[in-house]
Amino acid sequence: MDDVVRQIVIRGRVQGVGFRYWTMREAIRLGVAGWVRNRRDGSVEALFAGPADAVADMVARCRNGPGAARVDAVEDQPVAANAEKMIRPGERFSQLPTV
């Protein structure tokens, strides 16, 4: 299956509930590369790269998130031109600073 890249924004009660750590753990478990970060507007943004089925599974998992989260929406975003370059060398998946 071909590799894909998806950039999403998750809205709801998604900060202060372990969402970034959960996302990183789930992505590594699925073999998905990328990053996750908080945004100042209270949302969480993530980029997932890898086999199409694994990326789709990761996005689907984000619709529920960890137990303490309340996900109101998961929005697909256009992949920013530099988004893939933000995957840190030597790290398959990472948490980036808040933007």
UniProtKB/Swiss-Prot annotation:
It catalyses: an acyl phosphate + H2O = a carboxylate + phosphate + H(+). GO terms for molecular function: acylphosphatase activity. Pfam families: Acylphosphatase (PF00708). The active site is at R20, N38. Its EC number is 3.6.1.7. Gene3D superfamilies: 3.30.70.100. Keywords: Hydrolase. Residues 5-97 form the Acylphosphatase-like domain. PROSITE patterns: ACYLPHOSPHATASE_1 (PS00150), ACYLPHOSPHATASE_2 (PS00151), ACYLPHOSPHATASE_3 (PS51160). It is an enzyme of class 3 (hydrolase). Signal peptide: none annotated. PANTHER family: ACYLPHOSPHATASE. Belongs to the acylphosphatase family. This is Acylphosphatase.
